[in-house]
Amino acid sequence: MFHKRKIDMIDFQILSILQKDATLPVKDIAKKVGLSNTPCWTRIQKLQELGVIKRKTAVLDPEKLGFNNRVFIFIRTNQHKKEWADKFKKYILNQRQVIGLYRISGTFDYLINVLAKDIGDFDQFYQNLIENIEIYDVSSSFVMEVMKENTEVPIQTLD
């Protein structure tokens, strides 16, 4: 939902450029979309104010930083009260190894995406999890090969 302001094609072009390289100077972005600097800068500011641009960040390579294991943890709970969900969410969000937390449909209730340096590092995470949070069932899958990973939103398909 885009709230108070309609996103136009120039905004989509700006967003596409920023997704690929958020370090580009405004003057370079403006040139690519056919605007002068000030209107381009204003559009970027508005997109940030609307929350369309959440933040500008660097994408790091986990393996080059020693995180050689990516693990998806599937959690099933038999506790569906707000108190349990709040405790679970607070605990998981405070774990530095967690790079994603999702409430999902299907057989499991939650999916956690974790980076671990090795099996021992993951086991420590797992042991702490089951010690601190009452969980009905847990299943973990280690990523064998990353075949595609992308942070870009496919905005060229948005209407």
Predicted feature locations:
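A compositional/biophysical signature of low hydrophobicity enriched in polar/charged and small residues
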Residues: 1-159
